[in-house]
Amino acid sequence: MLSAQLNDYLAEVGLTATEQQKKQLVDFVGMLNKWNKAFNLTSVRDPEQMLIRHIMDSLVVSPHLKGSRFIDVGTGPGLPGIPLAILNPDKEFVLLDSLGKRIRFQKQVQFELGINNISSIESRVEAYQPEELFDGVLSRAFASIQDMLHWCHHLPKADGCFYALKGQLSEDEMAQLPAGFVVTDIFELKVPKLDEQRHLLRVIKQD
């Protein structure tokens, strides 16, 4: 059932995936549903809704990623990082979260599904000092873009960028970007079976 729905959704948004990747994505939903009952990893309880609100909501970002090394800040159970890592085995993803139960879940997912391009790290973002900086800093966890840029400013390379996943856009929020940051792109994301607005903002730091 989920496999057939995933096929339809991928076709609808123009994304391609191998049979192995599709199996990993469906199995990830299964693990998230199973662990969620004990560890409360997400407020979404229904696997079909997980496929839409977590898997597809993450995957539609994929065509807009530039570079090979990314960090997903405040990733929770691995969103959007794990679906993006499955679809992009040539890219490296660091998944950062401050809660141990979420990191344990992510590591179990990596082990059971054989995902080799993820590193899960338990840390608060302000305390995390990577040895190598990132092409892209991703997050759907922050309440505002200002918060994201404030807490994550030290993570991208000089030519790297921030990818903020947002719902409805607020003109006030856009007008209050910290000095030295510029929104270069606003992408309207279409998620199958989801009526709510979804946007991806690409932000760069200017000298």
UniProtKB/Swiss-Prot annotation:
Specifically methylates the N7 position of guanine in position 527 of 16S rRNA. It holds the Pfam family GidB. This is Ribosomal RNA small subunit methyltransferase G. It is found in: Cytoplasm. Belongs to the methyltransferase superfamily. RNA methyltransferase RsmG family. InterPro entries: rRNA_ssu_MeTfrase_G (IPR003682), SAM-dependent_MTases_sf (IPR029063). S-adenosyl-L-methionine binds at G74, L79, V125, E126, R140. Keywords: Cytoplasm, Methyltransferase, rRNA processing, S-adenosyl-L-methionine, Transferase. It catalyses: guanosine(527) in 16S rRNA + S-adenosyl-L-methionine = N(7)-methylguanosine(527) in 16S rRNA + S-adenosyl-L-homocysteine. CDD domains: AdoMet_MTases. GO terms for molecular function: rRNA (guanine-N7-)-methyltransferase activity. SUPFAM superfamilies: S-adenosyl-L-methionine-dependent methyltransferases. Its EC number is 2.1.1.170. NCBIfam families: rsmG_gidB. One of its GO terms (cellular component) is cytosol.
